[in-house]
Every structure is written in structure tokens, then in C-alpha cells.
Amino acid sequence: MAEKGLSKRTYLIYGMGVSYFILDQIYNQWLSFYYLPPSNEVTLKPLLTPTLLIFAFIFGRMIDAALDPIVGYLSDKSKSKYGRRSFFMMIGGLPLALTLILFFFPLKSSIMATFLWVALINGLFFTAYTLVSGPYNALIPDLANTKEDRINLSTVQSTFRLAFTAIAMILPGYFIAKMGNGNTEKGIRLTVILFTVLGIAGVYICAFFLKERELTQSREKLETLKLKDSLKYAFEKETIIYFAAFFLFFSGFNILRGVVNYYVVSVMELSVKSNTIISALLFGAAAIAFPITGKLAKKYSYKKILIADIAILIVGTIGLLFVTKDNRILAYPLFILCGLGLSGSAFIFPL
């Protein structure tokens, strides 16, 4: 007897859960800008040196790396009535929202106090981030009854992730200018609160309304890997190669996301509000190309299309190196080109 596929409701609610990427985008795009604003940003003052900010970031990432297998193991063993993955999302959601907001209300009594604040909040942020993101992504194999379900869940996640990332990249520049009314710090704080509430709402919609326990009841009796066995798989050759490629690509992707604000303000010499236009071009191109990329990938293989998309992205980013205030009009088609590359490389590669 053929396995019954998942309902449209399940796909929709699962897709809502990746709204934590709104918080991820705010973190990557606006945190550095807030603590290390460009010199022509008159209402913000540098709060940390680049070196101290990097050390604070590294501390958070170390926490993330250390907790990931532990959270995976604990969620595998969970017997919560809400579902073993949803339970951890519920635990991590509110701390994730609170810590993101606290980044933008730092201690300012001294540079060391600010550094310790950022390092501490960063560690707590990534603890909460791991509690949400790890179990959420683990839902795909738990929920899928068939190979088609698995592909569809991955596609839904990628589509929603693209949409949520676009929302968090395109709209904040406008809201910061509008809500700040000339005060960038005030605008950033109010915008962060607004988008954090929006982002975390989707996480709780997914956690409470997915009905994970009901959908995975027949699977929870399956034997799960021991922690030491999970760690052993993590050091296999194929896993290391995949992780290295994943790490290198997303390091570059996060750099691109993180420098957009600086690029618009310092290189193109435009206002923060202009970031809305640039981000709309970048993610608009990615959104338009995304379904086309998917069809081409099925026809010619994901590997070939992924290589082509990365090549397009490389050409676009190299071109951006030669943009100045005098020829800044060239940045617009180059960001569109980057968006075309991102349509596959950033949103198909994780599948």
C-alpha cells in the first residue's frame, strides 16, 4: 500500500517555521553596521573595534558548533507531547528573539563592557538559534513519508527561506529611515523589534500548529543514533567535504549580506534607505530566477546548474569591486547578476 503524502496545510505550516531567517538576516546585515558604522553615518558612533567585534562573533559561532550535535541528540531522544523537534523550537524561540533585540541595546559605559555584552549575548543568541534551527531542519526526514515528500518539504523550505530573507533584507532600510526620522539608532532599534516579532511568530506557528507528534507517531519508535555514533559520522570524508563546501560558500554569502549596507553608504555614497532598492534588485532577481533554476536543475542536474550559478555569482561580485561613486549605476545590473546566481547557489545548494 502506497504511503499517503503530506497535506498542503502541513507544507504551509512547515514553511512558516523558517521565518527565523528574518532574525538571521537582521543579525548578518545590521549588527556590524550598528557597532561599526561607516564614517559618513552621522547619527551612529563606533562602539567596538573591528578586532573585538570579530572575537565576539567567533565566541558565538563556537557555541553554535559545540551545541549543534548535542541539541540534535537531545531532540532525537525527546518524548514531548508537542513533538520532539517542535518542543525545542518552543524553548528556543523567545530567547532567540530577546537576544537579537538586546544586541541593539548594549552597555556603553566602556569599550570592554560593550565587548563583554556582545560576546555574552552572542553566545546566548546562538544557543537559542541552535535550539530553533537544528530541530526545525531535522523535521524534513521526520515528516517525509516518501521521497516526493522530502523533495517537496525541501523546496517549500527553500521558497519560504528566500521570501523571509528577502523581506528582512529589502524592507528594513525603508523602516529605519521612516521610524528613525533622522535618528538611525532609534530607527534600527524599532525596526529590529518589529521584524523580530514577525520572524519569531512563524516559528511558534510551526511549533504549535504543525501537529508533529501526530504526523511522526509511526517514526518515533525507530532506533536513533547514539551521540558518539553521530560524532563518528560527522568526521567521515563525505561529511567533511560537504561541510567544507557548505562553510566556504555560506561564509561568502554572509559576507555579501553583511556588506550591502556598507557598500550602499560608503561605496555608492547613498543613504541607508537606498539599501531597500539594492536589496530588492538582489532578491527580486533571485526570486524570479528561482523556479527557472529549479526546472533547469531537474533537466540538466543540480550539480551543473549549481556550478553555473556560482560562476554567475563570482562574476557579479568581482564586478562590484570596480564600482565607485562616479559609475555607481553599474552596481544595479551587477546586483541583479548576483541575484541570478543566488537563486541556485544559496537556495538549492542546501538541499
Where do the protein language model's features map onto the residues?
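Membrane-embedded alpha-helical bundles of multi-pass transporters/translocases
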Residues: 1-351
